[in-house]
Amino acid sequence: MDSPRFPEETVLITGGGGYFGFRLGCALNQKGARVILFDITQPAQNLPEGIKFVCGDIRCLADVETAFQDAEKVACVFHVASYGMSGREQLNKTQIEEVNVGGTENILRACLERGVPRLVYTSTFNVIFGGQVIRNGDESLPYLPLHLHPDHYSRTKSIAEKKVLEANGLAFKQGDGILRTCAIRPAGIYGAGEQRHLPRIVSYIERGLFRFVYGDPQSLVEFVHVDNLAKAHILASEALKADKGHVASGQPYFISDGRPVNNFEFFRPLVEGLGYTFPSTRLPLTLIYCLAFLVEMTHFIVGRLYNFQPFLTRTEVYKTGVTHYFSLEKAKKELGFEPQPFDLQEVVEWFKAHGHGRGAAGQDSEFMLWDGILILLLALSVLTWILPSTTLSI
C-alpha cells in the first residue's frame, strides 16, 4: 500500500533534528504536510521549503509549548525524540529518565491542552526483548518486567510507551474531541547517512577492532531501512483517523524489513565493501557479555573523569547476539504496511563518498596493536570475572 498524502495538515516531529526524524519530516513534506521539526539541535541538512525547525528541549514544558504555538493547529505529533539508545549515552541514567519519561509526559500534556487528535510514538523492540530468545513474536507478548531490563534506556522506553498507549482516548482539556495514540516498535535502523550506529561500526572496522564475531552463527535479528520506518509511521498516523475506523488507536506495532538475518552477516557487505576482511574468529557470547559488564563498570568508576565510548554494552551484546525477531502480520493487516527491499550497497557508497575505506599504508601495524589490546581485555575478563554459579539466560 502506498502511504497516503497529507494535504494542508500540520505535523510536529520531536527529535526532528536527528536522522530518522528529519527523514520522516521530508517524507511527510513530500506528501503535502506542513512540518515542524522540534529538537535541541538543528538538522545538518538544509531545510526544504515547507519544513520549519523549532529549537527546544523536550524536558522543558515551556519549550514544548512554544513548538506547538508556532502552528495554528497540529493534526499529528510524531514523538521520535529519545536518549540513551547505545554507547556511553546508555549509561547516563539521569538524562535518559528526563528525556524518555519526562519528555513524553510533556508531549502528552501539550497534546491534550492543544487538542492534538493523533500521536504516533517511536518505541523499540526492547520493551519486549531483554535477552530472551524470541522467534516470530507478536504484539500479544507481555512487556518485559521493568526490573529485568539490562539498561535504563529500554526500561524508560517501556514506561513511556505505556504512558502513550494509556493516554489513548483521553479527552482534550478544552473543547470536544479525544487524543488517539499508537506506538511503532522498530528494529535497528539503517540507511545512507545514518549517524548513530553505522559510523561507530565503521570506526571499529577502520581501527582494527572488528577482529571477531560472537554468539551462535544461527542467531537471527532484524533491521529496518529508514524509508520503511518512515512509511510505517505515516500509515500509523492515517490509521488513527475516523475514515480508517481508528484501527490503530491504543495499539503497538512491530516494524522491520521482515527479513531476519544474523547480525554479523548483515554487516558483511559493509565490511567487505569498504575493503576489509570479514573476521573468521568466533567467541562465546557469555565471554563477550562479561567483557561488556567490565567495560560498563569501568565507565561507572572513571566516567566522570574520562567519558570514553564503551566498546560494547550488555544490551548491545544481547541485541546483536541473541535471536529475536517479530511478525509483521498485524502491521500489514491493520496499517497496510509492506516493506520494500533494501540492502547495504547505498550505505557502502555513502561511506566511500565520505572518505572511508581501506587503503592507508601502515594500517596493519595499527591492527596488530588493537589485536594485542583486545587479547589483553579478553584475558582480563576471563581471569577477573569467573562466576561459576552464574548462568546467562538467553
Curated annotation (Swiss-Prot):
Places the protein is found: Membrane
Keyword Transmembrane belongs to the record: yes
Major localisation: membrane
Annotated InterPro entries: 3Beta_OHSteriod_DH/Estase, Lipid_A_modif_metabolic_enz, NAD(P)-bd_dom_sf
Residues binding NAD(+), per UniProt: 157
Active-site residue list: 153 (proton acceptor)
Signal sequence bounds: none
Protein name per the record: Short-chain dehydrogenase/reductase family 42E member 1
Pfam (any one): 3Beta_HSD
Similarity comment: Belongs to the 3-beta-HSD family.
GO molecular-function terms, A-Z: oxidoreductase activity, acting on the CH-OH group of donors, NAD or NADP as acceptor
Enzyme Commission numbers on file: 1.1.1.-
Gene3D superfamilies membership: NAD(P)-binding Rossmann-like Domain (3.40.50.720)
Keyword field: Membrane, NAD, Oxidoreductase, Transmembrane, Transmembrane helix
Membrane topology recorded in Swiss-Prot or TrEMBL: Multi-pass membrane protein
Organism: Mus musculus (Mouse)
